[in-house]
Amino acid sequence: MSAFNAFRQRYLVRFWSPLPALVALGVASACYFALTGTFWAVTGEFTRWGGHVLSWFGYQPQDWSYFRLIGLQGTPLDRIDGVMIIGMFLGALCCALWAGNVSLRWPTSKRRLLQGLVGGIVAGFGARLAMGCNLAAFFTGIPMFSLHAWAFMFATVGGAWIGVKISLLPFLRTPLKVGATASALPSAESLARRARLQARLGLAVLALAALFAAWRFEVSLVLGMACLFGLLFGGLIERAQICFTSAARDLWTTGRTRAAFGILLGMAAACIGTFAAIRLGVAPKIFWMGPNAIIGGILFGIGIVLAGGCETGWMYRSMEGQVHFWVVGIGNVIGGTLVAIFWDQLGTRLALPYPKLNLLESFGPGNGLLLTFAGLALCLLLVQLNASRFTRPRKPNHEPDRQTDPVA
C-alpha cells in the first residue's frame, strides 16, 4: 500500500475517535467566539430560515417579538451563523465524499420518517424555548458561564431517558423485514470506481467552499472566518461521527462513556479559551435561568432520541445521503418556528420574568471558573459511576440446583 493510500485509509476513510475530536471542537469553539463575538450555534439560524419561509407567504415575521430578539436582518449569506452553517454542510459533505460514504439511503420503514419529523419538531421547539440546542445551551453554553446551560444539560439527559422509554413502546418499534433473496453486493471494481468519483467530487466541494469563503472575506473578515470555522466544525463532526444523542442515550442503555467524556472534556477546554476571551472584553451570551431552560431541555432530550439525532448528528448524516435526517432537519426548522410564533405567550411566562445568571458575575471571575470546572469534574464522576451499573456482575435469578453425593 502506498503512503497516500495508507494516509487516506487512516484519516479520510476510517472514522476518528470522538474524544479527541470533541476536545478539538471545544478549543475551536472558543477561538470562534473570540474572533467572531458569538458562539457556535445553529438552531437560532434555522429558526430564521423558518421566518424567511413565512415571509414568502405574506407574513411579517420581522415584527414578531422573538425575531426582534434574535434578529432577522439580511439573508443567511449576510449573517455569521448562516455563513458558518453553510460552511458546516460543505465541510461535512467534503469529508463524507473523501471517505466514499455518500449514498442515498432510505429508512427501512416509512414510520421512521414520521418519527423523525415529530422528533425533529419536538427537539427544535425545546431548543428554541431554551434559547439553544446541544451547542448554544450545552456544549458552548456552559463555557459561557450561563447557569441556564447547566439546567438545560441535566434536563436534556433526563429527557433522553424519557425518550428511550417512549422509543421502546411497541408501536414505535420498526418491524424486521427479511427478503426472500439475498441482495447483490457491488463488485470491488465498482466500489473502487465509486470511491475515485467521490474523491474528485470532494475536491470540487472543497474548491467551492474556498471560493465561498473568499467571497465572504470580501464582505468582512468575520464572515470569512465564520465560513472557515464552519468547514472545520462540519469536517470534525462527520469524521468523528459526533452526535450528542448517542452520548445521552447511552447513559441509559449501554453505559458507554467515551462520547460523554469527550463532551465534558471538550467543554472544559472551551472554558479556558472562552474565559480568556471574556476577560479581554468579548461579551458572553447569557440567557434566562427560568422554567424555559428546564422544559426546553426535557423536550429536546425526548425529541433527539425519537428523531435519532441531535443538531450536529442530523447535519452530517444528511450530507451522507441519509434521507431520514433530511426530514429531521425540516422538523427542527418547524419546531423552532413554532416557538417564534407563540413566543409572546411562552416567553412572558417561562423566560422573560427570570434573571440571566452569569457565574462569573455572581461568584467572581476566578470562583466562577473554578465552580464550572468542579461541576464538569462532578459530571465526569457521575458518568463513570453510572457506567459501573452496566459492568457490575448480576446476581443469578435463582440458585443453581445443589448436587448431592449419592449415598454409598
Question: Predicted regions span which residues?
Answer:
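Membrane-interfacial helix-loop segments of redox and metal-homeostasis proteins
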Residues: 1-408
